[in-house]
Amino acid sequence: MFRHGVRTFATTSLRRMAAVAPQEPSQYLLNVSKAQGIAKGLTGAIGNTPLIRLNRLSEETGCEILGKAEFMNPGGSVKDRAALYVVKDAEERGLLRPGGTVVEGTAGNTGIGLAHVCRSKGYKLVIYMPNTQSQGKIDLLRLLGAEVYPVPAVAFENPENYNHQARRHAERLDNAVWTNQFDNIANRRAHIETTGPEIWAQTGGKVDAFTCATGTGGTFAGTTRYLKEVSGGRVKAFLADPPGSVLHSYFSSGGKLIERSGSSITEGIGQGRITDNLKQDVDLVDGSMTISDEKTIEMVYRCLDEEGLYLGASSTLNVVAAKEVAEKLGKGSTVVTMLCDGAYRYADRLFSRKWLEQKNLLGAIPEHLQKYIVLP
């Protein structure tokens, strides 16, 4: 009798909790919402990523510094959004039919995102990339089902650039499309329709500035466009740039493309031209800044130590930019940035003493954080 009573009570309690779960926190303080229901395949799980408060930096600046956790996308990065949209765009325009082939020139996360999306939709994927990329990256893309062609790394203006080779490959095939991530504005549309609205909803419209770096231009331009329009221009937009990129000099010089030498430890960001994704929204940029590799690598270690966030260098460059924008705007401001991906694909470099010494970056990491340098 006693056991039966306990069972009845437990069943009744669980049913009551299930009934209220979509509306309020459970007894374990986990916010369970209808949005976290069953995704319709892999593509249904792309987007709707959390916005994480970076506690230590928020306390330091007296602002709310928030990072969009794009590493939680199924392919592990913000590029899943663009990958899905460029494929959907090709489908909608009749350029890609069942059993077709997607071709792209990419050296990083866009290829991984496309590999996941193409596998889930039944398309073949062909990737052209510079032969300077690691064997591990090539192996990963092949593991995900892609056909990979590493080609000599040459400037965009050279007809043998990996992007142009990808275009020509697609032209030779029937039922194939070159998704052209840099100049295909479906990339930008992904962020106008998903990232921007998510940020606005998650902050309840209480956002003062958005900042991130850009490679294709899609994330920065699309998110900026939405936030500017929905706020009536109130939200400020600041572009962050790694060393060697021309974008900061372009905006700070009033529109002059000035060649810059040098390189950065970051991957997938920085640019030598104004892409079509960025071109439409250059007038929306309120300011720009160059973030040094020294600041970026220090923030890799700070985010791990202080926030428990294991982030890649492009993500921590964005975090540094968000901190600088917060300091510029003053206490009480809310600044949002993108946590593009995690450090999992870069650990053999970012946490290697030998690599840090080769890049002259070991001294940029405070001594108390060097305990995380666990690789030789």
Swiss-Prot record:
Uppermost EC category: transferase
Q: Which cofactor does it need?
A: pyridoxal 5'-phosphate
What this protein is called in its record is Cysteine synthase 1
Which pathway does it operate in?
Answer: Amino-acid biosynthesis; L-cysteine biosynthesis; L-cysteine from L-serine: step 2/2
Tell me the superkingdom of the source: Eukaryota
Q: What would be an example GO MF term here?
A: cysteine synthase activity, acting on O-succinyl-L-serine
Alphabetic keyword roster: Amino-acid biosynthesis, Cysteine biosynthesis, Mitochondrion, Pyridoxal phosphate, Transferase, Transit peptide
